[in-house]
Amino acid sequence: MTCKMSQLERNIETIINTFHQYSVKLGHPDTLNQGEFKELVRKDLQNFLKKENKNEKVIEHIMEDLDTNADKQLSFEEFIMLMARLTWASHEKMHEGDEGPGHHHKPGLGEGTP
């Protein structure tokens, strides 16, 4: 009998599968080179990184910041730090200006006005 995955578990699988969708294109199949990373950011993070996508140098800087071992590639471990940062930033945006009792959510990153 197969257990049905929760939404969170499916979302984790989606992150892994998306990473591999790009990482297998060139070079080592389990790392993202600069071109693969740029393509992933442009296609799959176009709303979360709207401003950053307009400037190629900014995307390069993001990769350099994530590339902790300076090998010009991103391992999954390095890439997942971007996912963690974006998740945190989106959560913070949802609570921006949220004061007082209760728990309210506004649109996060990639939501709201274009």
Swiss-Prot record:
Residues carrying Pros-methylhistidine: 105
Residues that bear Phosphothreonine: 113
Name assigned to this protein: Protein S100-A9
Organism: Homo sapiens
Pfam families listed in its UniProt record: S_100
GO terms assigned for molecular function: antioxidant activity; arachidonate binding; calcium ion binding; calcium-dependent protein binding; microtubule binding; RAGE receptor binding; Toll-like receptor 4 binding; zinc ion binding
Annotated Ca(2+) 1 binding sites: 23, 26, 28, 31, 36
Region called Disordered, residue ranges: 93-114
Subunit structure: Homodimer. Preferentially exists as a heterodimer or heterotetramer with S100A8 known as calprotectin (S100A8/A9). S100A9 interacts with ATP2A2. S100A9 interacts with AGER, and with the heterodimeric complex formed by TLR4 and LY96 in the presence of calcium and/or zinc ions. S100A9 binds quinoline-3-carboxamides in the presence of calcium and/or zinc ions. S100A9 interacts with amyloid-beta protein 40. Calprotectin (S100A8/9) interacts with CEACAM3 and tubulin filaments in a calcium-dependent manner.
Location within or outside the cell: Secreted; Cytoplasm; Cytoplasm, Cytoskeleton; Cell membrane
Chain positions found as S-nitrosocysteine: 3
Blocked amino end (Thr) modified-residue sites: 2
SMART domains linked to this entry: EFh, S_100
One GO cellular component term noted in the UniProt record for this chain: extracellular region
Metal-binding among keywords: yes
Keyword Cytoplasm found: yes
CDD domains reported for this sequence: calgranulins (cd05030)
Membrane topology, as annotated: Peripheral membrane protein
